[in-house]
Structures are given as C-alpha cells and as structure tokens.
C-alpha cells in the first residue's frame, strides 16, 4: 500500500487510547471493551516494544485481511467513553465513569488513505493494560509532559474525525466549553452538566497530587473556567449534589477554589502563583480590586526572579497603586525587567532615559542609553509595545546632536513596522506622508488610503477626516468620488470630538454635501466646533449673529477717541507756533464748532489755562485740565476712560511746552519769577517750587 500523509499526533493519541481500528470503508465505532488480562497472540519482542512505546507519536495498527471489523474501547478512570452503549462491555474489569453525553455524527466516513498507513511493527491494542486507579502513562512520560493528570477526556472528535485539543491550562479561552456547546447548543444550560463532571474528575485527580505545577495548573484552569461562566440566575443541575445550583453560585465556588490553591502556593514561594494571585487582586477578578495585596505579591514574586512581576511592581511604584510613589525603586525594578529582555520594560526605560523622566539625569550619556534601550525594544516589539519603533522613528527623523544622525529612510521603516503592529498614530502619519510625499517616498494614493483606513477603523478621528477628504475628491484608482461616503466619515470623526470634523459636517449640512440641506443641523455643528475653539466656526457664528457689525462699531469708537487725543496735541502745537494764549483759544473754538458736547471740554480747558496764567504768571492750568478731563470721563465706557487717562498725560506734556512759550513772550513775568530767589518769604519759595515742577 502506498504511503499516505502523516496522522496528527493528537489524533494518534486519541485513537490509541480508544483502540479504534480502521478499514477502507470508513470509521466505525463499536461500544465494547476488552478484558485487561486478555491474551494476544504476539511474540515477546513485540510485547517489549509495545511497553516502551510513546503513544503520543504512535501509528495506527494495520488490520489483517482475516481480522474482523471490531472496534474496542479501553478507558481509564479519567477518560470517558464517546458513546453511551455499554451493554456488551465487561464492567468487572474496570471502574465505570459516567461520560459526557456527546452525540457524534459519524455519517461522513473517512477512508484509511486520508488517515495514513501504519507500519507492521506498530503496537497492538493488547499493549494498553491499565489498573482501576492509574492511566497508561509511565513516570518518565509524566516528567516529559510536565503533567500528572490525564486530560485526554478533553479531546473531542467531530463528524469529520478531526481531533481538536482544548488548551486547558495554556489559554484564557476555555475551548472545551465552546466545543461542548456546539453539540448541546450555546443557550442550553445543560451544556454545563458534562463539563461539571469533567471538572469533578479533574479535581479528584489533583487532590492525589502534591506537585506544585499540577496544583497551579488546576488553579489556573478553575480561574479561567470561572471567568468564562456568565453570572446569571440560570439553574444548572449538579450530579454530585441534590438539587440545582445557579451559575452565579457556581462561579463564586470556582473563584474561591482557585484563590485557595493560589494562596497555598504563594505562601510556599511559588512565583507563578504569586503573580497570578496578584493579577487577580489588581484586576478585581476575585470580587474587588485590592492593590495593596497585589503589590506585596508582585514584589515577592519579583524577588524570586519573576520578570513580569518586576515590571508590574515598577508600575505600582510609578503610579502609587497599593504603595507610595517611589521613582527610584520603580526604575530599579524596571531595569531588572529590561535587563531580561522584557519588551515593555525596555520601551519604558528607553523613553524615560531619553526624555529625562522619573528622576533620571538629562546628560548626553543617559539620552544615548535611552536610544539603545528603544532600539532593543523596537527589535522585540509586539502589539503591546508597538509604540517603541514609533518613538525611535521620531528620534531618527529629527536627529539628536552628533550622536543620532537624521535618517528619514530608517525612520520610515520604523513607522511602517509600528503601523504593521497596529500602532494608530504611525498609521495616520504614514497616510499623511503618502498623501503628499516627501524626500524619501513619493506620493501614493493607494497607500495613503490604506493607512488612513487602518487607523480610522481603530477609532482615530484624524484618519476619519482624511478618508472624508479622499472620498470627497476621489482617490483613483482606489475609488471614485463619493460624497455620501465622505459624509459618513465626517460624521464619525465629528462624533469622536474632532473640531475640524465638526466644522466640516456643518459645512456639509449647509451646502447639502452627501446629505439633505439642513441649516438647523449645520448651525448645531458649527456651535459644537466653536465650543471646541475652532476659529472658522467662531467666525461663522459671528457673521450669523452680527458680531462683525458690533465689533466694527467698537473699533470705530476707539478710532474716534484716538483722534481726540491727536486733537489735543494739535491744539498745543498750534499754540506754540502762534505764541499767544488768545489765539490758541480762538483756534480751538473754531475747530470744535461742529459738536457742542465736544466743544465744552477743550474750551473750558483753554479758558482755565488762560485765567491761571494771568493770575499767577507761572502756573499753566494743567491741574485744572486734569480735573476737567477726569470729570468728563465718568460718563464714558471703560475703554474710553482708559484712553482719556492717556490723554491727560499728553495734555500735561503739551501744557508744559506752552509754559516755556509763555516765558519767552512775556519777559516781565520771567524776571519776576527770578526775584523770589533772593527773598526769604515762604510764599515765594512755594511759588518757586511750583515753577520748578512745571518746568521739569
């Protein structure tokens, strides 16, 4: 017979454990069992070979030409039968165990050629001899597999004879429950009945073992099972106890059992159990979050060399979870984990070293070490540390002193690596680069749309708006212009809170792009964008509410007040050119004839100035003008009042200039001002001080 493809090892193990024979017509099962002490016609040499056979890699036995088609089952104490028909079995040779009720569909027969041929020296079913309390595995095989519990009952055989292995201890997802539900229905509560029997058999075998690895795997399995059970009041029939039990009570029972085993192992210093128990405390898997207990266990496991626990302890010290913040200790745990190639620890240590965080120095050597740690993290980057190549790409894109030379080509490679690992900012940045092109890569519409789509599907609002722009303009040959699709992406980005997208959506509603024209919705989105400080939306609302007109009035009023200040200086400059106070007064009176309210203040200002000059000969009337200006500013607005105070200063300066002009035109007054210098009269001294103050 020609050789056929190799049989899957799990399938071989299942077939050997169940003593299934095949012929060319297909797979047939018979529900009968052999006696343990049955004598087979095999020679001694073959019997010795069979005793040392590793059944995980064994081949299926050949059926001789005269051998009848008989399928025999030999089960261990922990291996259930695949059928319920045990009428012809001899129960006195083994302990019966109630199996799960599985209805297998064997209508699709599989030929022997599809399962593979077997050599002539393969072991016969008689080599599988068992006792009532042991399985067919030897002690050496147990050490190889690192399991002392036979979990072959977790293998299921579907209608196509394909063997599926459930990862009972390796994976969080409980695949066995999914497989059983396939036959019994996902919404059928009785699907837990065979599962509970399986768990009970697993529990009884674990109680006989003192191996910490076995106990830990059982606790892990119970924890995973409890987390996959839905918390509901649906009743499940328990075969071991009278009555029914709800799924919520069953979940609590499994959680307590898992927690009990993990606590016992943690006390003995088993680091894996310490980490799993701490993770359950920190995540609230056991009912509530207990960060303090979690930190103690993380720290204890880290001291035993558990790398993940060291990283988690560093995080607790950094964030103050269950303990006080301590940057120095956090960095020490981080260095321990990073030195053992923990990707997240290498990434964080590189980031902190380059940017000088967590109390690390900011010298060049520390920054260079940060670049090295980021490079190591990028080389081992995964989906959880996809930001490592992104941060390293930013450094190589900009460069750093003479240590890191800018390399845009290498930066692009790092951006692509980060985007391939699912890093959203890298995908958005690549889309923007390919949209316009740069010195390293040219414009590529297809790649731009690809990266925009990748980031948009993960919720990036900037990428959504980028796709909106492409659909609004068209991105051939990828796709043609589609305003409806552009509107949908703008709507998603606006709902995500992007101000530009909110303004864009308002524009679409206003002009009917991809939707019906609706001004009410348009102004609604304009208001949202303005609330998020979008300048275009703010200007849009001002134009609607007449804000521009009110701003124009305020600006016009401000200009008039400024021109009023210029008028004061104009009047004073004219008085200095003419050289007489009377001409200044007449000039100001003729200039303000148009507005009586405005004429009052300058006229009173000049009249008081003239009267004071004639009376004292020295004082220019600046104090009176200031009082007049301050009294007139009471009815003005706050803005005009501030401008009037500036006007007062210019008026006083212009009056000081006019006082010099007065002293030149009237020499008699000038000579009289010098006489008090030789007198000892207090009044004359006060007049001299006033005169000096005005001149200064």
UniProtKB/Swiss-Prot annotation:
This protein's species is Saccharomyces cerevisiae (strain ATCC 204508 / S288c)
Biased composition, class Polar residues, residue ranges: 129-139, 576-593, 605-634, 651-661
Q: What does this protein do?
A: Activator of the chitin synthase CHS3 which polymerizes chitin, a structural polymer of the fungal cell wall.
SMART domains, per the entry: SEL1 (SM00671)
The propeptide segment or segments lie at 694-696
What is the name of the protein in this document? Chitin synthase regulator SKT5
Chain residue ranges for the region called Disordered: 37-67, 90-145, 576-696
Q: Which gene encodes it?
A: SKT5
Could you tell me where the Low complexity compositional bias lies?
Answer: 104-126
Cellular component terms per the entry's GO annotation = cellular bud neck; incipient cellular bud site; membrane; plasma membrane
Basic and acidic residues composition-biased segments: 41-53, 662-675
Q: Give the quaternary structure.
A: May interact with CHS3 and seems to be an adapter (along with BNI4) to link CHS3 to septins.
């Amino acid at each position: 017979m020609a050789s056929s493809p190799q049989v899957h090892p799990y399938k071989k193990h299942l077939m050997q454990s169940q003593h299934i024979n095949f012929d060319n017509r297909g797979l047939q099962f018979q529900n009968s069992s052999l006696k343990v002490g049955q004598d087979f016609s095999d020679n001694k040499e073959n019997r010795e070979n069979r005793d040392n056979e590793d059944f995980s890699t064994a081949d299926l036995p050949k059926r001789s030409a005269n051998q009848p088609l008989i399928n025999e089952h030999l089960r261990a104490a922990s291996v259930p039968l695949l059928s319920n028909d045990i009428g012809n079995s001899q129960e006195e040779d083994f302990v019966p165990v109630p199996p799960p009720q599985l209805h297998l569909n064997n209508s699709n027969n599989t030929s022997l050629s599809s399962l593979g041929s077997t050599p002539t020296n393969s072991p016969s079913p008689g080599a599988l001899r068992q006792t009532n309390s042991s399985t067919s595995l030897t002690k050496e095989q147990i050490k190889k597999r690192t399991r002392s519990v036979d979990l072959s009952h977790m293998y299921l055989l579907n209608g196509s004879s394909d063997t599926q292995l459930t990862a009972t201890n390796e994976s969080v997802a409980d695949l066995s429950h999914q497989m059983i539900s396939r036959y019994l229905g996902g919404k059928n509560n009785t699907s837990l009945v065979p599962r509970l029997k399986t768990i009970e058999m697993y529990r009884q075998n674990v109680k006989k073992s003192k191996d910490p690895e076995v106990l830990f795997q059982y606790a892990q399995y119970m924890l995973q099972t409890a987390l996959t059970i839905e918390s509901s009041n649906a009743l499940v029939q328990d075969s071991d106890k009278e009555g029914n039990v709800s799924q919520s009570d069953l979940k609590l029972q499994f959680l307590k059992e898992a927690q009990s085993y993990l606590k016992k192992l943690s006390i003995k210093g088993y680091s894996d159990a310490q980490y799993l128990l701490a993770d359950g405390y920190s995540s609230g898997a056991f009912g509530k979050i207990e960060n303090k207990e979690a930190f103690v266990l993380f720290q204890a496991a880290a001291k035993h060399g558990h790398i993940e626990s060291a990283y988690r302890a560093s995080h607790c010290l950094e964030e103050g979870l269950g303990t006080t913040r301590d940057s120095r200790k956090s960095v020490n745990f981080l260095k321990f984990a990073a030195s053992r190639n923990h990707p997240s620890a290498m990434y964080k240590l590189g980031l902190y070293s380059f940017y000088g965080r967590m109390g690390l120095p900011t010298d060049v050597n520390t920054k260079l070490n940060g670049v090295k740690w980021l490079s190591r993290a990028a080389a081992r980057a995964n989906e959880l540390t996809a930001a490592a190549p992104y941060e390293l790409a930013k450094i190589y894109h900009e460069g750093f002193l003479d240590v890191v030379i800018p390399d845009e080509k290498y930066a692009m490679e790092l951006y692509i690596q980060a985007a391939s690992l699912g890093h959203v900012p890298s995908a958005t940045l690549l889309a923007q680069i390919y949209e316009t092109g740069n010195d390293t890569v040219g414009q590529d519409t297809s790649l731009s749309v690809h990266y925009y789509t990748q980031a948009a599907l993960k919720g990036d609002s900037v990428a959504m708006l980028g796709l909106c722009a492409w659909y609004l303009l068209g991105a051939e040959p990828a796709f043609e212009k589609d305003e409806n699709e552009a509107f949908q992406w703008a709507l998603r980005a606006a709902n995500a809170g992007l101000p530009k997208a909110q303004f864009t959506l308002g524009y679409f509603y206003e002009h009917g792009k991809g939707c019906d024209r609706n001004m009410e919705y348009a102004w609604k989105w304009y208001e949202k964008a303005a609330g998020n400080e979008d300048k275009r939306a703010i200007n849009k609302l001002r134009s609607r509410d007449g804000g521009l007109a009110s701003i124009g009035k305020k600006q016009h009023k401000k200009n008039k007040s400024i021109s009023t200040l210029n008028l004061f200086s104009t009047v004073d400059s004219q008085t200095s050119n003419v050289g007489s106070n009377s001409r200044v007064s007449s000039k100001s009176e003729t200039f303000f004839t148009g507005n009586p309210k405005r004429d009052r203040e300058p006229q009173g200002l000049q009249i008081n100035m003239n009267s004071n000059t004639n009376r004292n000969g020295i004082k220019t009337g600046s104090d009176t003008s200031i009082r007049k200006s301050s009294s007139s500013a009471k009815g003005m607005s706050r803005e005009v009042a501030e401008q009037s105070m500036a006007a007062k200063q210019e008026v006083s300066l212009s009056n000081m200039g006019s006082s010099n002009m007065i002293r030149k035109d009237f020499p008699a007054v000038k000579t009289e001002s010098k006489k008090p210098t030789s007198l000892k009269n207090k009044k004359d001294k006060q007049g001299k001080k006033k005169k000096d103050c005005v001149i200064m």
